[in-house]
Amino acid sequence: MKIAIDARTLGSRPSGVGMYLNDFLKQLIKYEDMEFVLISDVAESEYIKSFQNKGIKVYTQGKKVYKSAGVYSYFTFVKKQLELIKPDIFWEVNTIIPVKLKGDYRIMITIHDMFPIEYVEYFGRVYNIYFKHNL
């Protein structure tokens, strides 16, 4: 089974979600019946390089994603990579997918924070709309 993963949170300076992915992936790569492919904006961190050294392919956009608007351009890149990689599963670790993905693969999303969904009044209208339309 081929699993493509959005590893952007692991690309440069991982914290929180990036470290979650790092720890989870270190365990998953022990399963020989799974092939992993990472997609990232950049591959600068020691963590992502350690997966490259273990033979995991990493496809990078070549420029860091800094702002929310940059995520849309990044996902255009992700969409193209998924067409080339042809995974069985695409795993989005970052909660949102801002573009419509189509393909012969299943999509798995990890939701780390339910507060914006459950307690809308604390996050404001813009964040609420962004979260709802990108999930």
Name these PLM-found stretches.
Residues 1-135:
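Carbohydrate transferase catalytic cores enriched for Leloir-type hexosyltransferases
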